[in-house]
């Protein structure tokens, strides 16, 4: 009899077999589920506090996705040889799991909940994010914690007009779409995607297809819960204090209505603070001992009712716009004189200063991912300091939100970047959010595209992004173009769409309620396209195309090709040759395994010199050619003469002059410059040289050392011109 009450469910999901089990591992957690998809295995656990902390006024959900290096048969690098701070991918995947789970916890549930997902085995072809999301949903479902799930998820690709369900990494390499969709049986809750300029219809079709296919996983979770689930918690939300609601409404409602007639954010924020203070004072005067959290929730509900009612009633939005109007746009390029490219993009009260920097191959980011090391030539970093919203706060390493926003903006721009062989530079974009009132990630997309063009990056098309909102009450709904921060906060769905004139490059949706249909999403995407095209028009008017010249402060680059066998000669022993080259010419030199060499410098002369010297190092000595040589060493029977970098040959004593030479020191000395002819090269690469043959061909002469400076007379005719000749 086993000590474990192990429950296993297995199902076929597209091309993959999925196995879920609970009851054996991590039994002291509230819920624990192992998910195995073709050898990619995750352990998902959830624990919830039995009661909320005193004064808790928000739902404290924490999601940690952790990749263990042993999952891929690796040992961590670094001094301590153990996993450290989360990688960017771990942070992004944690957010991916958090977003569809958070809306499904009941209103008023303020207990701490921690979801931890460990990747314990990885098949490099099967990404772990979808198994992790399914596992987290299943762990919550079996735990009995109040949760309106389960959630399913799927990755959708698109190639040759066909949707791909949970494609492998190899299949994703040629797919025009990478879309992750998550939701419940009845509704889509989250979409995260990157696309190669696809139409709205194709994108919506992918969302619908993904929602259909995830039902297989949802049904399997239901089966797992029936056999291995724990009893549901006996939890109910605290009863509403109707007397308090009435009192707060009496004081706050007229004041809040006044506040939401103020069009400027700073004035409105100040007024809302005054309203809150007035409510607190009125309650104290009435002798009501009210909980601050409860009062705050009532105020939030009143604000939502006012804003949502105004919009659904056809009244102007918070800042006076109708539902389709984009805020005024101002664009300025070349803002920073020493930066390689820069743009200031302002849309209403949201502003991004985006700066582009061009670098060389050595500036690429090397990412030691669980599935294998790779290099990234395009980076986008998003920063939002507290002053952007008129607040004080911590300044330092990026938070999860900043990493997520930067990733979304990056995904929007990747499809229009030139290929490596067209533009060999490493590119870094930094978006500094200097003002924020909604849609700062989409401002980063617009400003990022303009900064790239200002830097001379030949992007394929302009890319613009717009953040949309949606308010749904029964059968009535309103789609909002270019939402404000308050509209995002008080709405039912926010989605961000970025793309070109030809199609969508990135789409992100977060839906807080059920009941948003395919038809509503269709209307929302059509309105988003209208807004995107309006912004694209403004951008194209400000900068029609990328600059044809790079900034004077950006490095120039040339590429050349050598035989791969010659790479070691360019590098030299212990890197001595290439180090000397870079130092003496003031260049950066990168060598690929296929023999492609990239030389970069702000000095054109330095690049040309480095190229010339590399050509000399890699040049092949040709029999019958005459070279400038330097005597390196004298021997009894001849001399060692260098004719090319790394190419030394033997000048035999019989090949110096036609007469008999008794002592070589009578004719040659170390350091002496000579014109010598290569007369033989054997299969081992040994070279035989002749001074007398060169003299005979060029018509020069040589005198004994003791007769003066022994040097061949200059030839009357020009010698054969080679790159190696020019080097000397």
From Swiss-Prot:
GO cellular component, one term: cytosol
Source organism, top-level taxon: Bacteria
Enzyme class: transferase
Stretches assigned to the S1 motif domain: 624-692
Sequence positions that bind Mg(2+): 488, 494
Pfam families recorded: KH_1, PNPase, RNase_PH, RNase_PH_C, S1
Cofactor list: Mg(2+)
PROSITE patterns from the UniProt entry: KH_TYPE_1, S1
Cellular localisation: Cytoplasm
Signal peptide boundaries: none
EC number: 2.7.7.8
Chain intervals for the UniProt region annotation (Disordered): 702-728
Family (UniProt): Belongs to the polyribonucleotide nucleotidyltransferase family.
The protein's name in its UniProt record: Polyribonucleotide nucleotidyltransferase
Source species taxonomy: Bacteria, Pseudomonadati, Pseudomonadota, Betaproteobacteria, Burkholderiales
The encoding gene: pnp
